A protein has these predicted regions:
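Active-site proximal beta-strand in glycosyltransferases
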Residues: 67-69, 82-102
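Proline-centered loop/turn at the N-terminus of a beta-strand
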Residues: 91-93, 125, 147, 172
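Alpha-helix capping/helix-boundary segments
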Residues: 75, 132-134
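Acidic-and-aromatic substrate-binding clefts and catalytic sites of carbohydrate-active enzymes
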Residues: 68-79, 106
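Conserved donor-binding/catalytic core segment of Leloir-type glycosyltransferases
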Residues: 166-176
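Carbohydrate-associated surface elements
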Residues: 132, 151-154
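Membrane-proximal helix-turn-helix segments that form the acceptor-binding/catalytic region
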Residues: 109-126
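N-terminal pre-catalytic "stem/leader" segment of glycosyltransferase-like enzymes
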Residues: 1-73
Length: 176
């Protein structure tokens, strides 16, 4: 499993280097062209669904992109790729959902936070999922010097609706 993940990280990082060699300066500034840094998509799980929906509005561009959108729990670029993005002035937007804890993740949680911390601190802008997410990020990853804001996750109001209250008088029938 680790071999496959490491290979995937290497491939995505290689794509960043290739982009910087052949597409530097070719990025159109009047159009948003995003690279999602290898983040996966799917139907179950917040990150997978978030990227799937974002790709419907902003397709994934492996080359010629002018912005990179990374997620705290999708660490699919290595340090060299992230440094390359910074060197080539490609903005990094980082979505910070949470951090790793010993009680939740177990052994290796500190190393995972260390990896996350690198892209978190080099990002040009950070979206925090909540005040709690920002607090934990500052505690476990360190205080950021860059820009950011709290952007709460959206709720589908067509699916999640308030339950209609039933008034006791309208439903109660007494049989004699």
């Amino acid at each position: 499993k680790n071999f496959v993940i490491n290979l995937y990280i290497l491939i995505n990082s290689f794509l960043v280097i290739v982009n910087s060699l052949f597409y530097r300066g070719n990025q159109k500034k009047d159009q948003i062209k995003i690279f999602y840094g290898g983040s996966l998509t799917g139907n179950i799980g917040g990150t997978l669904v978030k990227i799937k929906r974002l790709k419907k509005k902003f397709k994934n561009n492996y080359f010629g992109y002018n912005c990179v959108y990374l997620l705290s729990n999708s660490l699919y670029l290595n340090k060299y790729a992230i440094q390359n993005l910074k060197k080539n002035n490609i903005p990094i937007i980082h979505n910070q959902n949470g951090v790793y804890y010993k009680g939740w993740y177990g052994e290796g949680w500190e190393e995972k936070n260390k990896l996350m911390s690198f892209q978190y601190h080099l990002a040009d802008y950070v979206f925090y999922q909540s005040n709690f997410s920002k607090y934990c990020s500052e505690k476990f990853l360190g205080k950021r010097e860059g820009s950011g804001e709290i952007l709460y996750n959206a709720v589908d109001n067509d699916f999640f609706k308030p339950y209609k209250k039933k008034l006791l008088g309208t439903e109660l029938k007494i049989l004699v």
